[in-house]
Amino acid sequence: MKQSHKTLLLWVLLIMMFLAIWQFLSPDSRPATQVAFSEFMAQVQVEAKDKDPHVESVTIKDREYTFWVKDPKSGTKTKKVTIGPDNADEITKTIVDNKVAVFFEKEDTSPFWPGAIMYLLPTVFLLVMFYLFMRQLQAGGGKAMSFGKSRARLLSEAQNKVTFADVAGIDEAKDELEEIIAFLKDPKKFQKLGGRIPKGVLMMGPPGTGKTLLARAIAGEAGVPFFSISGSDFVEMFVGVGASRVRDLFEQGKKHAPCIIFIDEIDAVGRHRGAGLGGGHDEREQTLNQLLVEMDGFESNEGVIIVAATNRPDVLDPAILRPGRFDRRIVVNRPDVRGREGILRVHTKKVPLGPDVDMEILARGTPGFVGADIENLVNEAALLAARQDKDVVSMVDFEMAKDKVLMGAERRSMVISDEEKRTTAYHEAGHALVAKLLEKFSDPVHKVTIIPRGPALGLTQQLPKEDRLSMSRDFAKARLSVLMGGRVAEEIVFGQFTTGAGNDIKQASNLARRMVTEFGMSDVIGPISYGADEESVFLGRDFTSRRRDYSETIANQIDDEVRRFILDAHAEARQLLTDNREILERLATALLERETLDAEEVDAIVGGRELPQRQRVVIPSYSDRDRAAKEKRRAASIFGTPKPAPST
């Protein structure tokens, strides 16, 4: 409603301005030229009215005669003359005798203000428009006219309700930050032994591990002013704005000291300085220089603690990482199985769970998941249960949600020919069988499916029994054999292969090359690393390439070893699938019948046992529900609402 009122007011002002301009420019309002009385009488008495200027008409208002002179050369002009009171009647008689039209006009007795307002209206309109324009610039969070002001948001305790009780799985990071909170609450406890509070804390870790959540917990626990800002809020298109915002941010911090300033994604402003297109005059470098000075420069900022977060510590400038600026570097790693169990318990506090839900089993089945992944898993499980009109979330919902998170959503509407479906079944059966036969050196098979998920026509999902922190050579070689299993199965069954193994070959080639050049797993090359990373400083080390620091002979040996690893894996997969051709056929047949096989069913097929019976869970889509509801309403309109049967 407020916006509509503003629009209506704007249209009213535009219409009034148009009327004022129209009145100002109308012929009646044009100013008349004052002339001498003799000139007026001469033009009144002109006889040759087709050649010389002559008077066409006269308007008499009080003692002022306004007359219109028609000049054949220059057109009509408006002139006026003021007559004395004694000879007004005689002059009027002369005008009438010369056959000039005479008009009498009453003296204007209207008030002064309406006319003044009409003349002042354009100026008022321009002032109002300028005021509205300035308010529009100042509106919102941008504040376009306050370029040099900091955009940091001061969070109050009422705005933030996250505490350390809501953080799980990263106990070491919590301990480090809780010590800083304790220092802020009781500084004398540490200062009596000569200790000082850390000036800065840098949280580093992969995306989704909980760095920003830790910062929100600090804001909820600190009991001191907490400023929050993103690294991208400093740099603008205008030169000097970033440095000005840094100064303003620390000025606010000094006024509210002791306080905490949190800079999220600090790599946006703290990237490595170096030679580039911008040189030393780059706006980002000016902002970084000002940030370095404010954090630990000539002037001290006692009581202002900087907490920053980044998932790219490798791109940060060394000057910002030194002690005195960031005294502590806290690595927020992926949680282990106990950490994942704790995160699951935090995120399921408000979710009604079924009696069959086991947090320990879920935690073991989600290796590599970070906090954001686990939160997404719980949310997907709750949504799946809601779509089935359940009252609680069961273990089946969590398993289906895990498959969706790991492998992508099912694309059951995708039309696949029987031939392609059969090829996909044998391809995935080859992966699964090789992985099962090499289970001593590889991760167990979690699920095999020929239902398209994401960009893939089928998937074989392997999950480790426990967190894997390193990789042996036997594991790497087994991984190569599993990757080759799909292509080899196509060769054995169909005598040819398809493009479906393209991604498998790419993964195998990358792994084999890393085994040779990085991990030292080749007996021929030895434990030597070849091809050091060449990092571009100006581009933020995003575009990296491996510099060739070896001879042509070594390059040929590397290529030969990569080829040998892959061909050996191909041969091993062929031998395993040839020796177990019958199991391969049973796996492919079961996939064509059931479309998806879990670990228990794969074990039963490989072990020669009968497949266990299962109840297929079909989640209705919203389009199916709408269609069913329409059919129900249509039937009710035709046959009427069915009455319940009488009880016997």
Curated annotation (Swiss-Prot):
Binds 1 zinc ion per subunit. The active site is at E428. ATP binds at G205, P206, P207, G208, T209, G210, K211, T212. InterPro entries: AAA+_ATPase, AAA_lid_3, ATPase_AAA_core, ATPase_AAA_CS, FtsH, P-loop_NTPase, Pept_M41_FtsH_extracell, Peptidase_M41. Residues 622-648 are annotated as: Disordered. Zn(2+) binds at H427, H431, D504. Residues 1-6, 133-648 are cytoplasmic. One of its GO terms (biological process) is protein catabolic process. It is a multi-pass membrane protein. Keywords: ATP-binding, Cell inner membrane, Cell membrane, Hydrolase, Membrane, Metal-binding, Metalloprotease, Nucleotide-binding, Protease, Transmembrane, Transmembrane helix, Zinc. Pfam families: AAA, AAA_lid_3, FtsH_ext, Peptidase_M41. Residues 28-111 are periplasmic. It is found in: Cell inner membrane. The chain crosses the membrane at residues 7-27, 112-132. Its EC number is 3.4.24.-. Signal peptide: none annotated. One of its GO terms (molecular function) is metalloendopeptidase activity. GO terms for cellular component: plasma membrane. PANTHER family: ATP-DEPENDENT ZINC METALLOPROTEASE YME1L1, METALLOPROTEASE M41 FTSH. Acts as a processive, ATP-dependent zinc metallopeptidase for both cytoplasmic and membrane proteins. Plays a role in the quality control of integral membrane proteins. In the central section; belongs to the AAA ATPase family. This is ATP-dependent zinc metalloprotease FtsH 4.
